[in-house]
Amino acid sequence: MLRRFSSTFKKKGDRESKQNGTASSSSAAVANTNNNDNKRHSKISAARKSSSDDDRNEKKGNSVSPFEKYASVLHASRSPIPNQTGDGAYLEHEHTTSLLQDARHLGFKDFKTLKEVIESKLPGGQLIDDKTMLMERIIQLVSRLPHNSKHREELTNAFLTELWDSLPHPPLSYMGNDYAYRSADGSNNNPTLPRLGAANTLYARTIPPLIIQPGGLPDPGLVFDTLFARQTFKPHPNKVSSVFFYWASLIIHDIFQTDYKNPNMNKTSGYLDLSILYGDVQEEQNLIRTFKDGKLKPDSFSEPRLQAFPATCCVLMVMLNRFHNYAVEQLAAINENGRFTKPADNLSEEEAKKAWAKYDEDLFQTGRLITCGLYINITLYDYLRTIVNLNRTNSTWCLDPRAQMEGSHTAPSGLGNQCSVEFNLAYRWHSATSATDEKWTEDVYERLMGKPASEVSMTELLMGLGKYQAELPKDPSKRTFADLERQADGRFKDEDLVNLLVNAVEDVAGSFGARNVPKVLKNVEILGIIQSRKWNVGSLNEFRKFFGLKPYETFEEINSDPDVAESLRSLYDHPDFVELYPGIVAEEAKQPMVPGVGIAPTYTISRAVLSDAVALVRGDRFYTIDYNPRNLTNWGYSEVRYDLSINQGCIFYKLATRAFPNWFKPDSIYAHYPMTIPSENRKIMKDLGREIHYSWDRPQYTPPRVDLVSYSNAKLVAEQQNQFRAAWGDTVEFVFGKASKEFKLYQDSAFIQKHADVMSKLLNKEEWHRSVKEFYEDITAKLLEDKTRRFGGINQVDITNDVGNLTPVIFAANVFSLPLKSKENPRGIYTEHEMFKVLAALYNCLYFDIDKTKSYPLHHASQAVGEPLGKALEANVKALGGSSLLSGIFRSFRENKNALKEYGVHLTKQLLENGLGAHEIAWAQFLPTVIAMVPAQAQAFTQIVDFYLSKEGSKHLPAIQRLAKQDTKKSDEQLLHYCLEAVRLNDMSGLYRQSETTLAVTDEAVEVTIQPGDKVFVSFAKANRDASVFPDPAEVRLDRPMNSYINPTLGPHGFLSKETSHIALTAMLRAVGRLNNLRVAPGVQGQLKKIPQPGGYSAYLREDHGSYSIFPTTFRVQYDA
């Protein structure tokens, strides 16, 4: 009897392990007196406390009858005597509830929760909004199910799995420089397997060789002669250029370097980490570095094997070297968050040595991450798009292995990569050697061996290569190629490098497929066949089956050419016996397909290479998990980032224009699409409707701009507008299309003077100036009120982004009825901030297009916004004349009338009455005026505020604040002088113009000759501190003659005189001067970061510090209420 009671009340948890989500009884169990009783218990359930369901029911007032509550006990009392086991106990049978029984425990809200859970798991499901408390509702749902519910267990398991999968196990990203930077030998890419993919580790094997091969394989020389040897050159069917295959050579040598002393060893890393540039191991890396400012030795690269390749391979390496050195210069100048701060001067010798070493190391390693980022983006968006023929489409799709995947069945990333012997063979693309490179290789044999390649034995070849390698200087900066000579600074001449690159762009590569390998490479290919046999790699069919491809059943399937198929049959007897390497070379090549097949490789290679590309990139932690702005810096991440709206993501032009800024036009097809020959590119772009986007002439040297810094020359260029015009070239036609003819009239002095005279007669000067002053004061004060954020008793406002940049926008919108969207005009087209960005982009494109790498994207962005803006203005002018169907819409822009709007309407109507057409008014008068005025005024305002809040100018702030509270003509004059002095002392910009004349000038005691067509840049920074013109040049003085100031950006702008800008800036300074205790915001937000640029001007950092702007974009200040 005691045993029966013991088995009756024993806890289930004592019998077996608890399942997820299954609750055990809360009653105390009778001690188990027999360990053998674990599986033999009474059917009577143990007494337990009420479940959550019972609690819920009781709270609802649903009382449970005693008969229901103790039904199991009553049932047991009527049960027959247990006799199912030898010791008189019942066999235990686990009973679970059905779906219908579970559903009875759930409410309507629970079913809604289930629906949301299912929706979140569907493909394309949105991220979970945790404000809906979905996770907590899941907990509620599961807790309401019975303890013996199978669905409770399944839901609990799913919940646990999701929580587990939310975090990586083990973590793949760690803190510290050991993991933040790439190691020299590629180790630590996967921290849990630190030697995976490192240099000097063994090759992996991709497929097991299971097929029993014949005892005697064909002679390698015979294989070459019958399957490999090129009889005639076959140009690539898609006209892919040699540059594509040179880039492929970089990739191949980046991840494969067989140790010929131990061919199972790979001496380089298994990652695309540019070890060809930086070195395979630390000792090699030390030889390429200067150990100063993070730089590499000029025009040098580590990999000596590339010296034996066609010279353009080396040119590409030099370009990457130059980009690295450019990148570290920018990193040091920006110094994001103090990451690259130079050591203090007061350190001890030992401390200083360590600090400078760390400074160099941080710059070098971050520069490497950035340069690798450019390298991989070119590989994915220029090189890979060419492989699959996406360059012949306008599609922005790309097979980017770094894609962020959502869901439970996603491809892992950052796990590492180990190169295999099979892919070492798969990447030998000698068939694609161009006719030019074939001839070059023959000449190399003659020069090194003294006889034709056909007469060079294998022994002689190996000895000759060994001798060549031994004679190469160990110091990369001492090496050269293509008989080029280094200059005094260690660099090669740009002209020599560009000629090699351009020739390669125009050089069509060879075709894949059987009998396309140059005979000059016979010994090289024999070595490859022999090595593949020593590696015991699987057969061609085994390789195909590994990738899910149908194995070849006949030789004709391998290659439909009867002669090639017969040669294969004679050599191998059966398709299963065809070796991997000879097989992938002798296979039939795919025919081009748009998109799909670009480089037309052989069939097996086409599939395998894409898998390897994904493995190489997705397996690399530095291209996936740790590829982010924090590691590359905001500037570095942005600089190498692709833009799908530009060339569908292709970015080779960034490398070309940074390396050779004076050779490639910003829109040169040679820079944008170098992996297909230009003549074929022209056909492609014509079909795509993009032919006009590019220039097609062969790159030529463009003299660098003439930089002038003296006051006399600055004044000359600023005032002689007929001799120095805006350097916009063909830009106006590209941006404004058919309206460009009218826009150019803005530079016609006769046209401007004629209509300025008309305007002066139409305007009441005194009344106009009063209206401008009142408007600017009111709008500035209103923006200060609306945009100020108050927290912790402090008022803070972005005085640049929310006040200085918007005030002239609102002014222009009122005068010219710009389609501005605001609270007052909700039917507008552009918001105030958008309008400023539009006008700033157009100004930059038309008047300050200096950075060639940024020029092409800038032109396309300007084209996208410029023409629509001009058309909107023209429609508005027509509306004022009452002749436009859109007059009702554009009248809404003027619903909120004020004096300035009335002036604008009046002037427009008068111009129409004076015989000017709406098209001419909009494109030759209004649009050029707005583009020139708005950004320039905004820039000047920020320069003024920045100066008087700086250490140098803050002593004048009390006087400005005193004058701001006065409303007299004298206070206006004094405030204007404060404005002009601040601009003089704080203007780091300049003028960029094109000369229309021949002129000889003296600048800083140097004779400079300027020719027609020369680009000229004058910097204001030095000119404005010329002591001969400005006595006490560093001081603010209010008595300087007005005509001594050089500030052409402040006007005149069309019919708006320079006085208009002067009044505007004075009014804005007055409004700001009325703020109490005005000061800069603490920290970086209160710093107007300027980066010095070549030529004596400074660029501003954008708010995210990711790129430069000629206009300030953000500057926060604080003031008291």
Swiss-Prot record:
The keyword Metal-binding applies. Its EC number is 1.13.11.62. One of its GO terms (molecular function) is oxidoreductase activity, acting on paired donors, with incorporation or reduction of molecular oxygen. The keyword Lipid metabolism applies. Changing residue 306 to A/V: Slightly lower synthesis of 8R-HODE. Little effect on epoxyalcohol synthase activity. InterPro entries: Cyt_P450_sf, Haem_peroxidase_animal, Haem_peroxidase_sf, Haem_peroxidase_sf_animal, Oxylipin_biosynth_metab, Ppo-like_N. It catalyses: (9Z,12Z)-octadecadienoate + O2 = (8E,10R,12Z)-10-hydroperoxyoctadeca-8,12-dienoate. Pfam families: An_peroxidase. Keywords: Calcium, Dioxygenase, Fatty acid biosynthesis, Fatty acid metabolism, Hydrogen peroxide, Iron, Lipid biosynthesis, Lipid metabolism, Metal-binding, Oxidoreductase, Peroxidase, Prostaglandin biosynthesis, Prostaglandin metabolism. The active site is at residue 253. Disruption phenotype: Decreased prostaglandin (PG) production in triple ppoA/ppoB/ppoC mutants. The triple mutant is hypervirulent in the invasive pulmonary aspergillosis murine model system and shows increased tolerance to hydrogen peroxide stress. Changing residue 388 to F: Increased synthesis of 8-HODE, synthesis of 9-HPODE and 13-HPODE. Retains chirality in 10- and 8-HODE. CDD domains: CYP_LDS-like_C (cd20612), linoleate_diol_synthase_like (cd09817). Coiled coil: none annotated. The record marks 305 as: Transition state stabilizer. Belongs to the peroxidase family. This is Linoleate 10R-lipoxygenase. The lineage of its organism: Eukaryota, Fungi, Dikarya, Ascomycota, Pezizomycotina.
